[in-house]
Amino acid sequence: MKKRNDLIKWVSVIAAMIVMPLHVRAEESTLRVMSYNIHRGGVVHLKQPLSQTAKVIQAAKADIVGIQETRSPRGDTLEDLAKLLGWNHDEGSCIVTRYEIVEHFKGGKDYKGGIKVKLASDKHAYIFNLHLPSHPYQPYQLLGIRPKWHKHTNNITFIKTEAETIEWAKKARGAEIGKLLRQVKSIPDKEVPVFVVGDFNEPSHLDWTEAAAKAGRHPIKVAYPTSTEMAKAGFSDSYRKIYPDEMKNLGLTWSPKYKLDDPTTHPDRIDFVYFKGKGLQVKDVKILGENEENADLVVSPYPSDHRAVVATLTLPKKTK
């Protein structure tokens, strides 16, 4: 009799869960957001086919990807990449996604703009994509590096102080980041998920710390203005949210082309996935790259000079 009563009890519990109102059941959905500089259309580095770039995105199991450098010597490859994935794409913002695109936001030369996508259960999210100027690049200015590959290599002013670094960074990228943040501020729903991804061509104040400078990882401590402005606007850096110790977890995205001790460059984390929104939480972040030493997910041959970053996030389902 006791066993029968226990069985009836559990059946009742399960039945109650089935008919429980949606607003009582606290469920979550998963979203993977990625930033990927594919380098000259994804067909130049190591002479890899575009399908290898698609393979990187597939390995990340991404849902939305902000792409930088879509133009190849033969033309723009964004549409072809979207076809390989079987996804939607937005030419203006250079974003590809498995979701329906319901709204477009115009950007400019470096701030690519953004889109609004329809997620499951009629939820929506916004994603904005950036590819900020690479010149002048403050780590090179501080370290006295003239990269042979850069067209502005003979037009670099060397600097020494944090104040100079911040000033030069603001001149290079301040206007574009300002445009982005004004557009984000104009979104009517202040609780909706918003993502900003891109190749920022500027390190983070969370990486260039006093501790990192004392350890010789960077020449000096710098409170870089772009990452600082993102934080002030309420955005979280997904990588540092999961890996707050900048001394232990480097998350380097620049660059698979060079060894870590190569004196002609400076290894750094300049590709980001930022997020904000009510109930939005990052659960995991992975770096995609060329080998296990430098990446969490390996695709070989790796078809870009930037490692990619993908963040897995959860958000509560829309309640009635």
Please annotate each region the language model reported:
Residues 35-51, 72, 133-172:
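Acidic/histidine-rich helix-loop elements
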Residues 3, 9-14, 18, 22-83, ...:
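N-terminal, active-site-proximal structural segment of metallo-dependent hydrolase catalytic domains
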Residues 68-149, 287:
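Structured beta-strand-rich core segments of catalytic domains in phosphoester-bond hydrolases
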Residues 31-38, 53-74, 127-130, 164-211, ...:
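Active-site beta-strand/loop signature of hydrolases that rely on acidic residues for catalysis
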Residues 107, 116-118, 185-195, 201-320:
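Metal-dependent phosphoester-hydrolase catalytic domains
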Residues 40-47, 66, 136-138, 205, ...:
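Short, solvent-exposed loop/turn elements at domain surfaces
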Residues 51-52, 81-84, 144-146, 211-215, ...:
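Glycine-rich, phosphate-binding/catalytic loops in enzymes
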